[in-house]
Amino acid sequence: MEAKQREYHFTKNAKAFTDMFSEDFLSINKGAINKPSRNNSYEMFDEYFKSTEFLKWDDNKAPVIRFSNDGSVAYVAVDKVVIVKMLNGNGKGIMDTANFAWLTVYKKYKNEWKIDCVTSTNK
């Protein structure tokens, strides 16, 4: 699923990316817990992807992957370097590099893994 997320960032496919989210999706970021609707998530990521060119979205370390005993829940902890060019209205871009660590919680719904929660930090 991490490979698909990377693909959707580079291809700017907000629809496919947010289709990975469960109906109960939670986002924990910048000291806040949010439960955005799928449509709100789509609109936010669509706008973000349209204004961003991803140059690098790579692991600094191998992801840590764990599963619940019954196999219905999993989590993946990642440490990534992300390099982007933020595009502005005049066609020029501003380069930005960030190191992110995040935890993605996956839950199985009708034999399909969905993203239930993402907790993200960056330095």
Question: Predicted segment positions?
Answer:
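Short, aromatic-enriched amphipathic alpha-helices that serve as compact interaction elements
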Residues: 1-13, 20
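Short, solvent-exposed loop/turn elements at domain surfaces
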Residues: 8, 28-29, 85
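A solvent-exposed, acidic/Ser-Thr-rich amphipathic alpha-helical stretch
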Residues: 14-72, 77-79, 94-98
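Short beta-strand segments enriched in hydrophobic/aromatic residues
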Residues: 21, 80-82, 119-121
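A short local loop/turn or secondary-structure capping micro-motif enriched for an aromatic residue
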Residues: 36, 75, 83-86, 123
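Beta-strand elements of well-folded, non-transmembrane domains
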Residues: 80-88, 106
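Extracellular loop and loop/strand-boundary signature of outer-membrane beta-barrel proteins
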Residues: 90-92
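Short beta-strand edge/turn micro-motifs at domain boundaries
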Residues: 97-123
